[in-house]
Each structure stands twice: as C-alpha cells, then as structure tokens.
Amino acid sequence: ILGAILPLVSGLLSNKL
C-alpha cells in the first residue's frame, strides 16, 4: 500500500514547493 501513498506524498511536497 505504501506504493500508493508515496506518489501522493510526493505530489503534496511538489505542490508546496
């Protein structure tokens, strides 16, 4: 399931940057 959460977290971090 982590594989589905990592991309979401990466997207949030990229959005904040």
From Swiss-Prot:
<keyword id="KW-0399">Innate immunity</keyword>
<keyword id="KW-0878">Amphibian defense peptide</keyword>
<dbReference type="GO" id="GO:0005576">
    <property type="term" value="C:extracellular region"/>
</dbReference>
<keyword id="KW-0929">Antimicrobial</keyword>
<keyword id="KW-1052">Target cell membrane</keyword>
<comment type="function">
    <text>Shows more potent growth inhibitory activity against the Gram-positive bacteria S.aureus (MIC=50 uM) than against the Gram-negative bacteria E.coli (MIC=150 uM). Has a weak hemolytic activity against human erythrocytes (LC(50)=135 uM).</text>
</comment>
<dbReference type="GO" id="GO:0045087">
    <property type="term" value="P:innate immune response"/>
</dbReference>
<keyword id="KW-0027">Amidation</keyword>
<dbReference type="GO" id="GO:0016020">
    <property type="term" value="C:membrane"/>
</dbReference>
<comment type="similarity">
    <text>Belongs to the frog skin active peptide (FSAP) family. Alyteserin-2 subfamily.</text>
</comment>
<keyword id="KW-0044">Antibiotic</keyword>
<feature type="modified residue" description="Leucine amide">
    <location>
        <position position="17"/>
    </location>
</feature>
<keyword id="KW-1053">Target membrane</keyword>
<keyword id="KW-0472">Membrane</keyword>
<keyword id="KW-0964">Secreted</keyword>
<keyword id="KW-0391">Immunity</keyword>
<dbReference type="GO" id="GO:0042742">
    <property type="term" value="P:defense response to bacterium"/>
</dbReference>
<dbReference type="GO" id="GO:0044218">
    <property type="term" value="C:other organism cell membrane"/>
</dbReference>
<protein>
    <recommendedName>
        <fullName>Alyteserin-2b</fullName>
    </recommendedName>
</protein>
